[in-house]
């Protein structure tokens, strides 16, 4: 009916220019340019295993993105709150781009969340197996929480209800709906910092660029799952896996380009 959903696209210092250029070259894929805003994710220093900060050049510290939990803070820093307020936005749908079947601004998901009275919602799928590498939506101390697969014990992962279903059986697909008002209330709250071992390019003492083949230090990230835990409640909204979950984590094999292509074809997409 002539209405458009504003899109806020988070980029990095590395890919920002290329991303904007890509949209411009494709004329924003027919979407009104005024409804598309780009912003750069904030960065934090990376260090070695002893806590020494790596250098990217003689004058620049090696930096890394601050994790997917930094999206709202990065929007605020980019001055986009004024745009959000001017448009009268009450809900923000945040999602990961490595799932090519994400259904965004889903009216049923939005409606279910609003009708529930909850201040957030999370799309979930039934886990394909107890050891599937997805975080699961649960409650912790009376508040919504997401337990990452690597944090779960074997006993937790395989626990079942009386009807045989997995006790922790609903995996998140990184598609969340948040009350904009609540996001502003928690904007200044301190989020947990997750220390992640990664491969960090840097220069050595002689000024040579080093691109390690093994993890050589730590990056420091905030995660969107911690934002869910900061909500008073969160409605789990189950979707059909084959219609909305095609993660791309690998080139081939499980959760790969190959499996994503087949799932897209199954949804009627011509490649």
Give each language-model segment a name.
Residues 1-89, 271:
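Conserved N-terminal catalytic core of the sugar/cofactor nucleotidyltransferase
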């Amino acid at each position: 009916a002539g209405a458009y959903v504003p899109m806020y696209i988070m980029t990095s210092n590395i890919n920002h220019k290329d991303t904007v250029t890509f949209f411009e070259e494709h004329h924003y894929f027919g979407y009104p340019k005024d409804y598309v805003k780009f912003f750069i994710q904030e960065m934090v220093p990376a260090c070695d295993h002893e806590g020494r900060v790596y250098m990217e050049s003689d004058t620049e510290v090696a930096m890394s993105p601050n994790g997917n939990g930094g999206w709202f803070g990065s929007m605020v820093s980019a001055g986009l709150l004024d745009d959000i307020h001017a448009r009268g936005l009450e809900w923000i749908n945040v999602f990961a781009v490595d799932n090519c079947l994400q259904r965004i601004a889903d009216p049923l998901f939005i409606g279910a969340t609003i009708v529930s009275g909850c201040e957030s919602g999370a799309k979930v799928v039934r886990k394909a197996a107890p050891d599937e590498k997805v975080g699961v939506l649960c409650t912790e101390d009376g508040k919504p929480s997401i337990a990452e697969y690597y944090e779960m014990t074997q006993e937790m992962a395989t626990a079942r209800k009386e009807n045989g279903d997995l006790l922790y059986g609903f995996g998140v697909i990184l598609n969340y709906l948040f009350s904009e008002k609540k996001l502003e209330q928690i904007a200044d709250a301190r989020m947990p910092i997750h220390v992640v071992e990664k491969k960090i390019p840097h220069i050595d003492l002689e000024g040579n660029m080093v691109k390690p083949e093994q993890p050589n230090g730590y990056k420091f990230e905030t995660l969107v799952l911690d934002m869910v835990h900061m909500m008073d409640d969160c409605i789990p909204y189950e979707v059909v896996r084959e219609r909305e979950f095609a993660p791309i984590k690998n080139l081939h094999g499980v959760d790969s380009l190959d499996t994503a292509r087949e799932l897209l074809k199954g949804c009627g997409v011509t490649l």
